[in-house]
A protein has these predicted regions:
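Hydrophobic/aromatic beta-strand elements that line small-molecule binding cavities or substrate pockets
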Residues: 9, 59-64, 89-96
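Structured surface interface patches that mediate subunit assembly and partner/cofactor docking
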Residues: 42, 110, 124-153
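Short, charged/polar surface micro-motifs in flexible loops or helix N-caps
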Residues: 53-56, 64-71, 77-79
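A short, structured loop/turn motif at beta-sheet edges
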Residues: 15-16, 63-70, 94-103
């Protein structure tokens, strides 16, 4: 894993609530546009990200789990055929309490093709997570939103 994407955001929430939002299927469905995660989140356990209809998107193993501070996942794309051959990657979630907010740092290490895909996806997902935790309302899925140019047409 030669390349790395790092995203840092500050969310008005507690580390416990943020951990729950990252690991609880009911939470992830709300801000990840129907996607949900399944695992017991113990070190060595399998985990899976699934579409709302149950199809697999991503699978892997929980490499580290220290609630509510650190979660490290082995990450295997199962859905996009162009990315399956890019090999496994690693996603690390670090949570730190800062007064009334939690600092979330997401680091994703991957080969270039997969890294390009996740570096476009993480900002959207994490912005929606932040909105959901702070306002109770997730952002719309950017894939379903017209651009300004399309709206003007």
């Amino acid at each position: 894993m030669s390349d790395r994407f790092v995203y840092v955001t500050y969310i008005r929430t507690t580390p416990d609530k943020l951990w729950q939002a990252l690991t609880d299927a009911a939470f992830t469905r709300e801000y990840w546009w129907g996607m949900f995660l399944e695992s017991d989140w113990k070190k060595g356990s399998p985990w899976a990200m699934k579409f709302n209809d149950g199809r697999l998107n991503t699978t892997g193993e929980v490499l580290e789990s220290d609630p509510p501070r650190r979660l490290v996942l082995d990450w295997h794309n199962e859905y996009n055929p162009d990315l399956i051959g890019d090999g496994p990657s690693r996603a690390t979630f670090e949570i730190e309490q800062l007064g009334e907010m939690a600092k979330l740092t997401v680091t994703h290490e991957a080969q270039p093709k997969l890294l390009n895909a996740v570096s476009g996806g993480w900002p959207k997902v994490l912005a929606s997570l932040k909105s959901y935790l702070e306002t109770g309302k997730a952002l719309p899925n950017p894939a379903n939103c017209p651009t300004a140019k399309e709206s003007a047409a």
